[in-house]
Amino acid sequence: MPARTAPARVPALASPAGSLPDHVRRRLKDLERDGLTEKECVKEKLNLLHEFLQTEIKSQLCDLETKLHKEELSEEGYLAKVKTLLNKDLCLENGTLSLTQKANGCPANGSRPTWKAEMADSNRSPRSRPKPRGPRRSKSDSETMIEASSSSVATRRTTRQTTITSHFKGPAKRKPKEDSEKGNANESAAEERDQDKKRRVAGTESRASRAGESVEKPERVRPGTQLCQEEQGEQEDDRRPRRQTRELASRRKSREDPDREARPGTHLDVDDDDEKDKRSSRPRSQPRDLATKRRPKEEVEQITPEPPEGKDEDEREEKRRKTTRKKPEPLSIPVQSRVERKASQGKASAIPKLNPPQCPECGQYLDDPDLKYQQHPVDAVDEPQMLTNEALSVFDSNSSWFETYDSSPMHKFTFFSVYCSRGHLCPVDTGLIEKNVELYFSGVAKAIHEENPSVEGGVNGKNLGPINQWWISGFDGGEKALIGFSTAFAEYFLMEPSPEYAPIFGLMQEKIYISKIVVEFLQSNPDAVYEDLINKIETTVPPSAINVNRFTEDSLLRHAQFVVSQVESYDDAKDDDETPIFLSPCMRSLIHLAGVSLGQRRATRRTVINSAKVKRKGPTKATTTKLVYQIFDTFFSEQIEKDDKEDKENTMKRRRCGVCEVCQQPECGKCKACKDMVKFGGTGRSKQACLKRRCPNLAVKEADEDEEADDDIPELPSPKKLHQGKKKKQNKDRISWLGEPVKIEENRTYYWKVSIDEETLEVGDCVSVIPDDPSKPLYLARVTALWEDKNGQMFHAHWFCAGTDTVLGATSDPLELFLVGECENMQLSYIHSKVKVIYRGPSPNWAMEGGMDPEAMLPGAEDGKTYFYQFWYSQDYARFESPPKTQPAEDNKHKFCLSCIRLAELRQKEMPKVLEQLEEVDGRVYCSSITKNGVVYRLGDSVYLPPEAFTFNIKMASPMKRSKRDPVNENPVPRDTYRKYSDYIKGSNLDAPEPYRIGRIKEIYCGKKKGGKVNEADIKIRLYKFYRPENTHKSIQATYHADINLLYWSDEEAVVDFSDVQGRCTVEYGEDLLESIQDYSQGGPDRFYFLEAYNSKTKSFEDPPNHARSPGNKGKGKGKGKGKGKPQVSEPKEPEAAIKLPKLRTLDVFSGCGGLTEGFHQAGISETLWAIEMWEPAAQAFRLNNPGTTVFTEDCNVLLKLVMAGEVTNSLGQRLPQKGDVEMLCGGPPCQGFSGMNRFNSRTYSKFKNSLVVSFLSYCDYYRPRFFLLENVRNFVSFRRSMVLKLTLRCLVRMGYQCTFGVLQAGQYGVAQTRRRAIILAAAPGEKLPLFPEPLHVFAPRACQLSVVVDDKKFVSNITRLSSGPFRTITMRDTMSDLPEIQNGASAPEISYKWRATVLVPEAAARVALPAHPQGPYPQVHERAGGCRMRHIPLSPGSDWRDLPNIQVRLRDGVITNKLRYTFHDTKNGCSSTGALRGVCSCAEGKTCDPASRQFNTLIPWCLPHTGNRHNHWAGLYGRLEWDGFFSTTVTNPEPMGKQGRVLHPEQHRVVSVRECARSQGFPDTYRLFGNILDRHRQVGNAVPPPLAKAIGLEIKLCLLASAQESASAAVKGKEETTTED
């Protein structure tokens, strides 16, 4: 049976022109009304027309075809003769069917006609086969030639010209019975519409045939190469015969056999005059395409033409039912159910889009324009014959060991191509061999010793294989990988591919070299993040051998599966105590982003990339002081053993997913874990899983669990109480008072001593109380009072807190107690026994004892009843502070309780009080001053109020809420917008709260109680309202170029409760200032000014009235000065003016480019004399901005070791700081080294002991600075179940430092980004422990979850401004709207401002004094697809990759992108409104991933819809920033597909520049960076935002001022006492 061919799309049947009689014409029309199916109608028409073809013409056509096959007639001559015959007897009257196409010949995605494929068994080509594969029937060359000729079709890629008679061969196929019945049932109903449709199609074809007659002459090309679309402009005489011939051929073929299927590679549009005529020619000496023996006889079923636009969808559906046959076994997925047409709307029903056909062997799409066919070399022979050629022999007959056949022969192989059994060129590295798909190759074999890759001296071979395995044998000592194939007969080292196969093989070489880059990069950078890996890939110059200009992120994502597999293979050879490098942060991101399948079988590749293990560069072993070392090796050892035991018990359960191939493998029986198993003769004690069966999926999951803490903190109670259980009453029978009563007060008789069971107890002693629950430890308390009343013999207990009840948990010293603010009255009978609690204060020489052997806290305390305490512990905020120095008065010693006094002071402080009364009018008492929380408020003061305290007469313009998203219209251009199921956009300020309302106090009054006393609980304030710019009728646009502290006076008044007042601020009339507005704004916190008044009735701005000025201005000009009338300004400055504060000598460890130092300098508290930074570019940037600082670029461990050894200078002669020199120590030690492990076992503990955190704590212990600050990522407080936090605080407490921790949001301190940072503050004994700074700006609530959960207890910082703040949020517009427009990749060092920005915030005032050019923009360069994607991201807020259109785009280098194919049903997202599929991989259907489904060079990255369902649809990737929003956390390399996500400029098609990132961090434009673009990005991304550092510095400054004031007061008091004594 001849092979079936692909019919052209069947047009309305054309009859021969004038040669047919009228009755025949009528009969042709009647056939269309006889109720026949479409196929039957076509068959009858063909039979009718065949009667009018003259016999001699048929004979002549057959003779011409025979001559063409025998090459006695050229193709040009054949076409000319056929044209003559056809023009003589046949004339086509309908023309060619016109079909629209895209530039590459592929219909738009979703608009493809219905495809169905039916696969039939085909005979294989003759060849010698290895025995395991089994014999196959061979065909003669004549049979093959007949099949090739009978199945030839006009195509772009075949090498033979289509013949005419071949279209009339073969019987017509009958339609299945069920289809025929359905067709008959619907035929009569659609009869009239079919007739109208045929007439319209015929007219269209006629017009198209007249307009599209341009076919180029056949062009001679290399066999097997892809032919591009032909150009217009050849001679008309040469084009017309060929076009007419092809039209007739397609029509005759359609009439003869409409069911014939397309051959692979056949383009299925009839109107392809500009493409199909280009055929591959060959020299006459070259044999015909022998690969056709392997090509399928049937691969694609008949294609139904798509009606012209405007046709009824019902017609298309009916046509498809008539002409489409059902395939017995679909190649891909079941077709989705059709969408029913709504009768009320009268619209067409949505037609589901079916899959394009695929090759059943290699899985490639048959309509892919890049699909190529194999062309064998000239005179090629099969493999056995080739191997016997003498040219391949390296031995002669005299060789004594010639006849040994222990191993397969090895040869070099060049000019090779690899193809499947159907002749499609295909890669070998996509898993086809692993799936037992037979792949063959052809080319030129050479002897193993040959080095010349040319074809000279080689033996041409064809159909070698099938390939049993392919392998990589490392590299050739340079950049080229050695790759080979193994067959049943020999092994072949590959040299150079054929020109046709070079693009495919180039990708294979590219992925191998990228794997080499990744493995070598991870060897030295195991803690690198994804952006660092992309930086490495993009900055590596590709070797010339692989013909790639540059590596990109798309290159890495394209080969991600292969790269991860190679990294896994590298990890297979690791030592047991080594951490797998595939668990590094960058590899986990790559695995998630690209959807890599872990644990796949890799046995088919004999060897992997052999990269020599390189000793990882990094910090040396941690240099620790003895105190720090003792903490880790003594107090934590028991916890380590406990965790190790838990690990061993749970390893077997945690190491299996049961799905991947690694888990399903049997135990190897050879590794250390297997040898310990009982079944392999071991003891079975270790209970470890086989090292070869450790599931990679679970390993990645466990590593991800600690990657980032969740934003949503569970609702847990704050540990404000000890939650002591019920106490157990003791049987104390003998309780008696000793001595006389001390005092009698309120029915209480106080005593000083008591005897309990012959044990004397007096006030001030400590006792233990047994809990009712025996599993709990003893409760300990200090007896502060003893008395007797009606309740019996009582005592007042001031409780101690055990270390395990603090944030320290199990890391605390078991003998250490902490004072807390809790006390209780109890009966003496509850006392268990007397204990001893010693206060251990700091030694007089504490600061100089650093680094020495630590003394025992309680030498000889082994009786179980002796404890010690150093600090007061605040359970609300986890603050360890020195105990208060309050001394009891002489008359209060018998009942003096520190807890009661502190609580009373706190209540007294929080209670509102009236200080000065003015008058009483109508039952109201008017006042001039009141106080609350230690702040005094007077008439004329300005105050903060919550946003709900009062409203404005102008209706507030609420933040613009985005309208509800309309249904996604996927008809014009398919997009993935449907994935945006949530309206939340990361980086949006839509939910940001309003800042405080501000008012000036006009009156203060309150009512009276019944007794005539002032009712201080009901104080009211009448005030004038201040408008902010956004509160006026100009709304938010008024803030674009206005200072953030600008207000407008208003005569509107409001009355508020004093309890609503949130604090005091300063508001001045700008014209009354004695300094510039900028100096005034920077002169202190909470400063505002106004220049105009706002009239809400007229919506106009006016001059402020006289009473708007501060009351103190009445004295202006009389020598009183400005300060007298404005006490709120002068009061905070008085202590600072009176006390000169020296700056702290600071050592900045891990300084980076100097963000912390810059903030502290702005706060005016420090002078950074030393800095340590190992990374040279950051160290150079620090030097540029701090020329007076000694910057060490050495390992911090080396420097500390030198100092501890008594060295004064380092190897470079730089002077080292000595003990006593450092007054403040600050830094942010990296902690990635132990961030990837889920449990704290002995291996991770060992790594933690050598981490930089331990080194930093040793610096603190040695130098003993006055203040200590540790900054780190927010997750620092959660690492290892908060164990890192606990150990850090434990070390500080053991050193004697007061300390606390908290999480701060940098966006609340004046930067346009969300950046949560963990801060640990510590103060030396005698200093005041700083509070955390109150927020200055409102910020998005989602980003302000700052609680920390430790051991199921929630801790918060001392911050009280939780719902609002003094200033509005800083936006992207504030940050960078004045910067000039720059292009992608611009690198000019200086660019002029677009316009000069005003002072937006006090922290950014440095912009005003800038030169005309800010330091370079330096945006990241993104070429090819990345830059093109940026240009297609819409400018609307919230846009990201899901808004990319699925279109073809020409890149700058001329390459045209492919459209992304959606060929699978997505079970989660369903189908589109048009019925189109939404899945890009078989995993969307719940199956395993198919590597053949991967797509490349698409505008929409294939990996994103592939893995989107598992990762929140990758929201934000390729995301555009919003002018009124903020940055995500600024990272070290802004990549559109990186962690930060939204990095595209709001209006320009590029990522944000270095200067824009620096501004988002709060760096002034005068701050200089060093190095290339990526170095600068890294410097900015790793820095602490200077505004945040400044806010912390100001809090430290307040502590210094308070200490200075106390010292001054003590000195004055001492002087007065001395004077009195004198």
Curated annotation (Swiss-Prot):
The active site is at C1231. The modification N6,N6-dimethyllysine is found at K70. Residues 149-166 have a biased composition (Low complexity). A motif (Nuclear localization signal) lies at residues 173-200. Zn(2+) 2 binds at C668, C671, C674, C690. Its EC number is 2.1.1.37. Residues 100-360, 702-733, 1099-1138 are annotated as: Disordered. Residues 1114-1127 are annotated as: 7 X 2 AA tandem repeats of K-G. InterPro entries: BAH_dom (IPR001025), BAH_sf (IPR043151), C5-Methyltransferase (IPR050390), C5_DNA_meth_AS (IPR018117), C5_MeTfrase (IPR001525), C5_meth_CS (IPR031303), Cytosine_MeTrfase1_RFD (IPR022702), DMAP1-bd (IPR010506). The modification N6-methyllysine is found at K139. The keyword Repeat applies. Residues 1144-1622 are annotated as: Catalytic. The N-terminal part is required for homodimerization and acts as a regulatory domain. The CXXC-type zinc finger specifically binds to unmethylated CpG dinucleotides, positioning the autoinhibitory linker between the DNA and the active site, thus providing a mechanism to ensure that only hemimethylated CpG dinucleotides undergo methylation. Homodimer. Forms a stable complex with E2F1, BB1 and HDAC1. Forms a complex with DMAP1 and HDAC2, with direct interaction. Interacts with the PRC2/EED-EZH2 complex. Probably part of a corepressor complex containing ZNF304, TRIM28, SETDB1 and DNMT1. Interacts with UHRF1; promoting its recruitment to hemimethylated DNA. Interacts with USP7, promoting its deubiquitination. Interacts with PCNA. Interacts with MBD2 and MBD3. Interacts with DNMT3A and DNMT3B. Interacts with UBC9. Interacts with CSNK1D. Interacts with HDAC1. Interacts with BAZ2A/TIP5. Interacts with SIRT7. This is DNA (cytosine-5)-methyltransferase 1. The lineage of its organism: Eukaryota, Metazoa, Chordata, Craniata, Vertebrata. The gene is Dnmt1.
